[in-house]
Amino acid sequence: MKQFIVSVAILAFTFPIFSWNNHAGITYLILKDHWKGKPTPKVKVESLKTFLSKEKSSIQETLSISEEWALKKLPHLTPTIESLKFSKTTKDADLVLSFYKALRVNPNHKAALYIQAVPKRNGTKLPLDQLTTLNEKGKLVNETFLSLQEGQIIGADEVLVSATDEPDYDLDLYLFEDNGSEVGKIYGFGSQPFGNPAIEFSSQAPFHMGFYYEPGIIFAFAGFLKQTYPEYRIHQFTELSKLAFRTGHPYWGYRFAGWALHYIQDLTQPYHSSVLPRVSAAKQIGVQLVSIVGYQSPKNNMINFISGRHTLIEEYQYYLIRNLIETKNWDHPVANSITEFSEQSFVKWQGIDLLRGNVCKEAYDAGDPMDEQLENLDIPKYETLYEPTHPIHTILGTLLNNTSKHTRAYLDALKSN
């Protein structure tokens, strides 16, 4: 009977999936003073194929380091099958595809040479279909992407700003065996543990969320919530970044670092580290059980109640950050929360092994008070930006201060390696 209830609960358990919108805008504000008055490093643009062709003897060794770490850390992760592993004898024409499959990411990701222009500026625009395979482009249609040429010199900040947004473009889409893709059948991730496998953007959710602090009874009924992979991605791209810097490829050093930062920034978002803030374990289980026998309204009401606040904070953050950058309103309290750091405010990057204990625990603990504060605002949905003294900016400023803090710590560690 218990197995039946657990099986049905797994099928019934659903919740809204959101992440920080506008990673590029947030990272732009963080990097405004990152080099503290020193010239921003310049790097030469390099295609992924060029990087792989020059360093192909080291690629699989680097990926194996990450996999060995991840297999010890993530009991649900299965080893990469031999046929997917990157070979130093791979033909040049197959390098990029082989690399993607060895990473176990979307093999159709484009890795175009581009920057996301933050703030907007003129240049040769890159069509969105050369950047992403997403059918629903969402807010990407609002952004400006400029095409680059191999050998062009650009700032490291431009690489990082652009790269922190890139994993959302399709890198983790359709990787599970029930997503209807060919790679989903061979990557070994099994069936999608949560979210709707039939919905495009939802298929990436287990790679961008990490639930480590739910009550034990929740994990007992919904153990699938443990099947997440952001740490795997952070480790992979951090090791690749180190390899790129070590072997004289700073463009890819920064770009891989930006990819890793995307997942770190996602985990600073409380709704990515807590399933349903302020909903007790008893209530979560209760509404799931009554839904099994046909009463869907309690579950639907609970999800709609919380998803409204998810949507509000995401939408508001997106349009506010865009506005702050476009108007250069650096004195706004949210801008100050991101950019103003005293020596006492800085933290050291503790490594991926301690990610759960600092980044994720901090976000989880912030979930309940944040959710209550948002409810008390009584704002049903985003409609307009409010005056700087509005309490929504205190909430958002606190959250983005944490995002900024951990981004800075990661980049400081990167500079010291």
Q: What are the residue ranges of the model-derived segments?
A:
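Active-site beta-strand/loop microenvironment that shapes enzyme catalytic pockets
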Residues: 241-278
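Residue-level marker of positions within ordered structural domains that often coincide
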Residues: 6, 246, 412
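N-terminal signal peptide c-region/cleavage motif recognized by signal peptidases
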Residues: 14-16
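Sec-dependent signal peptide recognition
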Residues: 2-8
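N-terminal, motif-rich segments that launch catalysis or mediate targeting to/interaction with membranes
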Residues: 18-243, 273-417
